[in-house]
Amino acid sequence: MFRYESLEDCPLDEDEDAFQGLGEEDEEIDQFNDDTFGSGAVDDDWQEAHERLAELEEKLPVAVNEQTGNGERDEMDLLGDHEENLAERLSKMVIENELEDPAIMRAVQTRPVLQPQPGSLNSSIWDGSEVLRRIRGPLLAQEMPTVSVLEYALPQRPPQGPEDDRDLSERALPRRSTSPIIGSPPVRAVPIGTPPKQMAVPSFTQQILCPKPVHVRPPMPPRYPAPYGERMSPNQLCSVPNSSLLGHPFPPSVPPVLSPLQRAQLLGGAQLQPGRMSPSQFARVPGFVGSPLAAMNPKLLQGRVGQMLPPAPGFRAFFSAPPSATPPPQQHPPGPGPHLQNLRSQAPMFRPDTTHLHPQHRRLLHQRQQQNRSQHRNLNGAGDRGSHRSSHQDHLRKDPYANLMLQREKDWVSKIQMMQLQSTDPYLDDFYYQNYFEKLEKLSAAEEIQGDGPKKERTKLITPQVAKLEHAYKPVQFEGSLGKLTVSSVNNPRKMIDAVVTSRSEDDETKEKQVRDKRRKTLVIIEKTYSLLLDVEDYERRYLLSLEEERPALMDDRKHKICSMYDNLRGKLPGQERPSDDHFVQIMCIRKGKRMVARILPFLSTEQAADILMTTARNLPFLIKKDAQDEVLPCLLSPFSLLLYHLPSVSITSLLRQLMNLPQSAATPALSNPHLTAVLQNKFGLSLLLILLSRGEDLQSSDPATESTQNNQWTEVMFMATRELLRIPQAALAKPISIPTNLVSLFSRYVDRQKLNLLETKLQLVQGIR
């Protein structure tokens, strides 16, 4: 059978696939075996060895030690009786020397040596799920029946019934391939290396002080574990790092092979001072990574080695008492324990000696080991599967658009963005942002007054205050350079498309050009007026922040800009007594112009605002026609309503006549008034008319000492409005935006009860009046 000079010679990383399909080369393998081990290495009858080992299971544990040598190979007899006697004498001398050591005596007195029990012989290391797992059957059971390989650190399978309780010797093994040299074992026989069920623990001194290395096969466990639901193949074992297989190559009941150098290193460590050797140094001692010390008392071991094993988490499981019968449930997925991870990270890479292998086997083994090392270096470099999985996923999810810009380009973009924030007047250059935060501050102040909760601190962007350098842009000029564009090429570019030229009259072109130019001028005026409006709205903030001596100048500047806004709206030219309405109507035909007028009205004086209202009332039918699509005129109702409360009765009457298109003289009005009809069919016009009637009635009732002429004009206007409201159909009448509350008394003075009810129905004032 095969022999190995030391523990490191066991080829643990051989691949099962590398040994298949080599039946044609049996003769070459036999020749290499003879050259390596000698011609008589496989001459013994291994079937008889099987039978002797099977008979040992029924004998007492006391007789096991006596029959162990008979169950081994015939090479054990080569030691001789004198060598065995010498080993016994040396072991007794070591035991006597140890008992004379006071440190060991204290350890023995405090904690006696545990006696091995039949049921808990191997429980110190091999029974816990958090410690190393059970060894499994031969790795190469078909080709090399004499070699046993440890099971990689896997969780212990829970008991699953009577089938697992049966002994390994009672199971029928599958038929194996027949070798011309070794032969085929019987089907019912136990594998080579299977120990008895109970075996005595060899003494520690006999393991260390053995005269020469003793080759012992590691025995089989009582039953097979089932890691991860299935057994690992040799291919999977080869993919496991070699350092992880160094946890326990032999059970605690079988001593490993210790070379003289290893024994010297082990005995030399006993002379060290306590604490001089770290767990990592202890794990690097060759041949000491197994379990030969597991069967010894932990206190005795600590005293012998000189307390060179501090109680670390990675080593506490090796030298502690046997764990409980019911280990705690594992909350983590099955995998190597913390002590195995320590050994994996601290122990050196285990490279078995492959000099006895066939050259073809050695080449295949080296190739597989190189592939495994490169794979583990790429995927398991940090030692954590979860972190590698996450890092691999992060690598797959990498942004394809990352690192497309250089740092210089990123800084350039950042500088451009910061240039937009560098301003001497942030309120003017960043108007919307500043207004947005002003609204937020007002809301927070209102919440503070109401006391609805703690004040919320809002982060506000602080713009850097730097001087803004104004410079005129000058295009780059290349004097005398080739390829310079000529003026004719710029003014008259080459025609790329043949456009169809339509003949148009000069009058049409002139008229269209005038309309286009007029609209452009109106848009320019609106933009200029809007800039003045923003400045005027900003004067309130500037007035509060200015000093006392600066405020008069600010007020004069504000008045000047308000007058400029009014002139832009009315289009008053220098030396012109009364401006025309055409300019204002053009502004009111544009949606932005109508909204601008609604914002300007509160800043104008009463006379200026009244002029704007009069102009709007005169041209209201045309403005209603232009506003059919936008419907922006209702935004003017609120500022007009506020203005009416500052106008006298005469102005109200004149405004009503302008709105109804009545002549200023007392002539008899026409029976039909299309101007007033258009006003009543629009919700803005009807709402403005009702507000004017309500305000005029209040003024007439509050001042009875009015002139008769003015009173007659008011009565005439009221009769005209009432007649037109009664004449227009209800379907054509628009729904007003707002309804005054004093219209009942207003109409009751000029119509009877029947007409009053009809007016109430049309204007939908029933609920408001009653």
Swiss-Prot record:
Gene that produces this protein: PATL1
Annotated positions of the Asymmetric dimethylarginine modification: R217, R223, R263, R284
Keywords from the named record: Cytoplasm, Methylation, Nucleus, Phosphoprotein, RNA-binding
Annotated stretches, region: Region N: 85-388
Species, as recorded: Homo sapiens
Region (Region C): 449-770
Sequence segments annotated as region (Involved in nuclear foci localization): 1-397
Domain comment (free text): The region A, also named N-term, mediates the interaction with DDX6/RCK and is required for cytoplasmic mRNA processing body assembly. The region C, also named Pat-C, is required for RNA-binding and mediates the binding with the Lsm-containing SMN-Sm protein complex and the decapping machinery. It folds into an alpha-alpha superhelix, exposing conserved and basic residues on one side of the domain.
Sequence segments annotated as region (Disordered): 1-26, 314-344, 360-399
Residue spans of biased composition, Basic and acidic residues class: 385-399
Residues with PTM Phosphothreonine: T178, T194
Example GO biological process: deadenylation-dependent decapping of nuclear-transcribed mRNA
Name assigned to this protein: Protein PAT1 homolog 1
